[in-house]
């Protein structure tokens, strides 16, 4: 025998309580309990509460579609009915300071090439000319300059002539002659000095030899005197 219940369902002994099913859960009390279901508290751990045999859940859940940040149609279960709604992301579009996540930021496109350079390059290649098109940022090539040869002073000339930086050719030639004569005189003096040194060395050797000869004569004279005395 079934008894009327507040939720409009029937409860049989030994069977299941087929009441209102808010989220697919089923309440099975003991078989000895014939009265309406009793609960210790109206609140649940998941945030819902019971009222007049019905279950009201405060937190919305999405069915059929994943949860996204912007513009996704979701369905929530509130008070025993489903209320689909469309979440608008107009506040993100109107706000200029909103930034997308790091991996979704759009890269600005590269600037298009200038029309003047593209037209000139295409016209140059279409005419079949061998000259490459000149770009806007090209610079003229530097002129080739042959390196200047370094002036070397001859060995037989005095370097002081060129240090005076005299542009007069006649005077420069006279200076060259004067310095040349000076060099010749210096060379002769060096030769004379060398000759004098040789003569002094020979004189010293001769004097030493004379001393040796004088000692030899003295020794021989002493020997003769000793023989005569005997």
Curated annotation (Swiss-Prot):
Record region (Disordered): 1-150
Annotated Polar residues bias: 25-34
GO BP terms, alphabetized: chromatin organization
Short name of any one Pfam family annotated for the protein: Lge1
Major localization listed first in the record, in broad terms: nucleus
Protein location: Nucleus
InterPro entries: Tscrpt_reg_Lge1 (IPR021581)
Coiled coil: 172-203
Highest rank taxon of the organism: Eukaryota
Gene Ontology cellular-component annotations: nucleus
Extent of Low complexity compositional bias: 1-20, 47-60, 115-126
This protein's UniProt keywords: Activator, Chromatin regulator, Coiled coil, Nucleus, Transcription, Transcription regulation
Functional description taken from the UniProt entry: Involved in transcriptional activation. Also required for ubiquitination of histone H2B to form H2BK123ub1. H2BK123ub1 gives a specific tag for epigenetic transcriptional activation, telomeric silencing, and is also a prerequisite for H3K4me and H3K79me formation. Its precise role in H2BK123ub1 formation however is unclear.
Name of this protein: Transcriptional regulatory protein LGE1
Organism, scientific name: Kluyveromyces lactis (strain ATCC 8585 / CBS 2359 / DSM 70799 / NBRC 1267 / NRRL Y-1140 / WM37)
Gene name of the record: LGE1
């Amino acid at each position: 025998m079934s008894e009327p219940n507040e939720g409009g369902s029937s409860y049989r002994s030994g069977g299941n309580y087929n009441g209102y099913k808010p989220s697919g859960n089923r309440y099975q009390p003991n078989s000895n309990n014939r009265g309406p279901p009793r609960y210790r508290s109206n609140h649940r751990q998941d945030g819902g509460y019971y009222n007049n045999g019905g279950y009201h859940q405060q937190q919305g859940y999405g069915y059929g579609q994943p949860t996204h940040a912007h513009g996704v149609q979701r369905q929530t279960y509130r008070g025993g009915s489903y209320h689909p709604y469309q979440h608008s992301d107009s506040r993100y579009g109107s706000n200029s300071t909103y930034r997308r996540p790091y991996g979704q930021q759009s890269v600005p496109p590269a600037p298009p090439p200038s029309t003047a350079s593209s037209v000139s390059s295409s016209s140059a290649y279409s005419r079949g000319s061998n000259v490459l098109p000149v770009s806007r940022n090209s610079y003229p090539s530097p002129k080739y300059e042959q390196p200047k040869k370094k002036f070397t002073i001859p060995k037989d000339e005095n370097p002081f002539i060129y240090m005076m930086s005299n542009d007069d050719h006649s005077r420069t030639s006279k200076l060259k002659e004067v310095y040349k004569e000076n060099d010749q005189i210096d060379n002769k003096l060096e030769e004379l000095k060398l000759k004098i040194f040789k003569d002094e060395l020979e004189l010293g050797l001769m004097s030493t030899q004379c001393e040796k000869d004088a000692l030899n004569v003295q020794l021989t004279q002493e020997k003769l005197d000793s023989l005569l005395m005997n």
